[in-house]
Amino acid sequence: MSEFTLEPLYDYPQREQVLALARTHASAVDRGERSPFENLREIAKDGLITLGRDGGSLVPQVSVAFDLATEDASTAFSLWAHRSTIAFFDAVGRELPEGLADATVSGTTAMAAAYKEASGLAPIKVEGTLVEGGLKLNGSVSWASNLYPGGVIVLPVAVQNAPESHPNRYIVTVRQDVEGLSIDYHRNLLALNGTESGTLKFEDVFVPSEDILSDNIEAFLHDVTAPFLLVQSSFCLGLAAGALQEAAKHLDVSQGVFRPEFPLILTEYQSLREELVRLASEPERAERRDLLSLRLGVSHFATIATHFELQVVGGAGYVATSPTARRLREASFLPVQSPTEGHLRYELARYDHLENLRDAL
């Protein structure tokens, strides 16, 4: 008999409470009736959203995101965006804005455009003009999440009037309710309705000089990519693990016809799990190619795992409000989450191309 035990990536004293909290409120969060930040504020009391800030192992932090996602991917997603925002301030040696460490203030990463421009896929769409005392911002960010009143947003800006030979790409922070910033919220999503996602529109938004976090975007991205992708990958894998846990209960369906596939799926799961732990153990040494490959791999695997769960659970899993259906919907978001499937495949193809060139030479 094939079995699956949901083992922690890293065991910590509050793990059972984290799982129970996520399980209890998963349906309400999915319906948009409860904010994921209500869950994050609970676990923040035990310091579980600020783990690994000393520059050491990220395994404890990715473990929390993984565990949340086995029961509720929306809360795990919100943790990823919030924890990434914390990492942005840490990368430039800034103190965290008040409320970020305990999740009484939300953190929003609007960094997709920075990664896209760095890869040659698309330009940064928020433009900045240097003015006395800071910058004026105009433009838009097509998608960001955790958009709560008073929240902290970090984003890249293309500076239009930077002096010659000076940097013209900045990383800045603004508050969600700053004058000139409007939000068009995305409602009735296929999944993750509780994540307060929307489009940001900037119209002459003033950013004081002290809120410019960096004018070295290349170095900034280098420093934040590992925590950004590792916590993201962990909740993708946690979502898949939740599907496998449920699927394992139904392997005798249809006279066990699906049973031979399960060990093969578990082998891939174990491989991805080991790679996640390896990279998170020493994030500063993680190679970018490995991080991108892991992120793409766990996204694909979540799709495989959730579809397998639906196959073995059967009609009960097709009920829209069931945990099986919720996981299937949540997994459908992963290919469009930044970095998108297209972005990941494009970057990895470039690595392959360079490798082929080296081999040819």
Please annotate each region the language model reported:
Residues 59, 130, 210-218, 314:
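Acidic-glycine-rich active-site phosphate/pyrophosphate-binding loop
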Residues 238, 263-270, 292, 296-303, ...:
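Generic structural signal for well-ordered, non-transmembrane alpha-helical segments
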Residues 34-140, 145:
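Glycine-rich flavin
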Residues 1-55:
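A generic N-terminal leader/anchor concept
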Residues 187-270:
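Glycine-rich beta->alpha junctions and the first turn(s) of the following alpha-helix
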Residues 316-361:
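Glycine-rich phosphate/cofactor-binding loops in nucleotide/flavin-utilizing enzymes
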Residues 23-30, 52-53, 252, 270-300, ...:
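C-terminal helix-coil-helix/basic helical segment that borders enzyme active sites and/or dimer interfaces
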Residues 143-181:
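A short core secondary-structure module
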